Swiss-Prot record:
This is Putative uncharacterized protein DDB_G0288489. Residues 174-188 have a biased composition (Low complexity). Residues 165-190, 235-255 are annotated as: Disordered.
Amino acid sequence: MSTMYAREYAGNPIKPDVNIFQNKSFKQGEKPKKLDEDYFLYSLKSLFKDNLNEYPGKQLDRPNKLDITAADDRELNFLEEKKWDEKELLKEQRAETFKNFTFPPHMSIQEKCVDQLQQDYDDFHMLCLRDMFRDKECDLEGFSRTPAQDKDELKEMNLTHESLLKEKSKLPLKKQQQNKSSNKINGKLNKKKISPNQKRTIIRQTKTTTTRIFKKPISSMEPITKTEITSKTITRPVTEIPSNDPKSKPKLSTQTSYSVDLSHLNNNSWVWDNGETRKL
């Protein structure tokens, strides 16, 4: 197959005068072979059973004209025309119904004009629903209503609305809790008026500091808890200003030490070594 060449490729016949063996090196006395066109009469079109010259643009939709009779060809043409006519008729019908389409009465102008493109798109796809409910066969009981039924329903709705208002009027009125911010008018606080006979009670709180006086000097007094200084006292140079940083102060902690004999325990550590465990 590597040496096979189609006579026609993409509808253009190859040049007969071009010799495909011209670049080949020949031995002494050997003549270049000529292209045998009878052997290379294969075509991609015949392999796919599709005659592109007879039906341009119809690639595999119809069989090769040579393989069918004239009656079959006429029938295929008739079916194609019928499909095309149905498609065009549907387009015309939909366009006509779209021209005469009216919005539902409950829709307001604001709803119509939110997004006109989206609205037109939705209304166009609502046409099939309108046609469905128009037919007597597909019509449902809930949708087939008379004007008298609509009037009765409106009366019933008004009655229920009025009865609800009556029931609401019987309920006791609750005082609304006034928010504190409601007292502010134009950013000024409405202060309560104090009568001249009424005296204001002012409570003044004073801070008191207690000092304890020891008879003995503090150096001679023993601390309440026995503590040990574990960290060394840090001596800072004089140039630095002393700070009350708790980290710089010596840590005070009580130390308790225990001596536990662990010699009798098997406390070997194990390691993973080349797929095996071994003791250290």
